Amino acid sequence: MRSRCNAGAMGATGAIGAVTLSLLLVAPAYAQQPPSGDGSTPLHWAAYQDDLAKVDQLIRAGANVNAANDIGATPLWAASVNGSAPMVKRLLDAGAKPDAALLTGESPLMAAARAGKLAAVDALLAKGANPNAKGARGQTALMWAVAQAHAEVVKRLLLGGADVHARSDTWSQMMAVPPHGLPEYNRVIPQGADTALMFAARAGELTSAKMLVEAGANPSDHDAWGVSATALAAFAGHGEIARFLLEKGADPNNDTPGFTALHCAIMRRDEATVAALLAHGANPNAPVTMWTPTRRSSDDYYFMPALVDATPYWLAARFTQPGIMRLLAKHGADPKVIHESNYVQGEGYQRRKDRTTAVMAALGMGGGTAWVPIDRAGRDALILETVQVAVELGADVNATSIDGRTALDSARAQKYAAVAAFLESRGAVASR
């Protein structure tokens, strides 16, 4: 949805031939000549190039202001892509239809909103442009303005009647996690049904989110999959939006997609949002109930199969967040939780089962990959503090994994001398 001035929409090369437009404009008859092979006219190009003088000449010579090329692009759409208010106004005054859309449904208003040009948006609305027209996948001008952080345009669209409850189209898509070839790690996931508020949560657009909620958007909104705006904001690292939505009454416990906003905030190491979620009633013991997909060879954040059934407290221990562990315990999290995992890893489809406490998780046992990497210089001290908090809150230092290993075994194997010494001081015994 990024703003693009794409000359390809009106032909990849100079569709008017070898003679330049400036020379051809000398002859008024040029305005009436047939369009080029892709349907583009000289008026398209003059509008696209933001040449107001040439546009004036062409219009006076009788050029069709509503001519559309093969993809439905009109001169007004080209001007709107540029966000040129003077050009938009000139074409509208000459009779250009404000809602003439591309074949995909994208209207001039949508293009101007994406460009973030308030004056162009205002001119289109003043001429009756539909603020709720939908383009590809059912997206609206309001959604595009929000996604591009054009808050002033968002405000104008809302004043012009844009629907805060409008949703994008819904479809389903087969998605997977590694190893992608394993049938049980492939499933159909609903996509779309996003409102403008969901776009704000994803993009981190707090100013727009506030305007949308004030205009009636539901703080507990969710998409077709069931991901809430709060969870999406936390997932995307926009804790300030998640906290705002909570203050406005958002449900902190939506777990429809298999995870909650609390899980996302922990994975993002966002202690402020974790605190806000707990203060608003988030369940400190809600487990991750389903893996989430990722693209092949990507750096996407996702809940891998090894994390299914993990609780917030275990996640905080696994990813060395002692402050969050204390917060969770204060709000009722079970610090003696034992995570039982059962998953497949590697292209060899190796089945693995793990049984780990918070102490073991802090040492990397139990699987899973961090979303936010920790600076290597401070990692050892953070692991030690996490282990200390886990033991302080009641974790069994001599619990064993399914293959018989203890936390002390892991500490020694990884040469965490300070951690091993601490565990020994608390009665830990090696199994091997």
Name each model-derived stretch.
Residues 13-26:
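Bacterial N-terminal signal peptides
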Residues 45-50, 78-84, 111-117, 144-150, ...:
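Ankyrin repeat A-helix N-terminal signature
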